[in-house]
Amino acid sequence: MTRNEKAEIISNLEAEFKTSDAIVVCDYKGLSVKKLEALRNSARELNVKVQVVKNTLANIALNNCGKSGMELKDTNIFVWGEDQLAVTKVVAKFEESNNELFKIKTAHIDGEVASVSKVVALSKMPSRDELIAMLLQVWNAPIQNFTIGLNALREKKEQTA
């Protein structure tokens, strides 16, 4: 790889990492190409990006955009995106199904280095749309119960009449 190619990769990664709210680094050693493609496809559906990058190039890009502090060793695959929950859900779900070959190593979330346990905890949280649905269900329940009660009262009065 020439110096110009490396510089281009670094600048592309910098631009991507600056706009991302979550960057997760995982070990993928021994994972088949078919499974890597499955990861990329599931990530693409949620607007999450997945790329294998050399550690030195990734480290330079991370340092240049102010997201340093992650220790990069061995083989790494980078998963990032603007939606923290989407990134963590993609990674955690894939780790569950490929536990022996795919491991979460470290992450950069909310401007700080995050542990594996934080990534897993974030992945279990409901998404924004799910939270809105829960809230609407809570708001709707009293009205629904009231109308059911009124309907039962009406039916009872019709039976007695």
Swiss-Prot record:
One of its GO terms (biological process) is translation. The keyword RNA-binding applies. GO terms for cellular component: large ribosomal subunit. One of its GO terms (molecular function) is large ribosomal subunit rRNA binding. Disulfide bonds: none annotated. The keyword Lyase does not apply. It holds the Pfam family Ribosomal_L10. Keywords: Ribonucleoprotein, Ribosomal protein, RNA-binding, rRNA-binding. SUPFAM superfamilies: Ribosomal protein L10-like. Forms part of the ribosomal stalk, playing a central role in the interaction of the ribosome with GTP-bound translation factors. Belongs to the universal ribosomal protein uL10 family. Part of the ribosomal stalk of the 50S ribosomal subunit. The N-terminus interacts with L11 and the large rRNA to form the base of the stalk. The C-terminus forms an elongated spine to which L12 dimers bind in a sequential fashion forming a multimeric L10(L12)X complex. This is Large ribosomal subunit protein uL10. It comes from Campylobacter fetus subsp. fetus (strain 82-40).
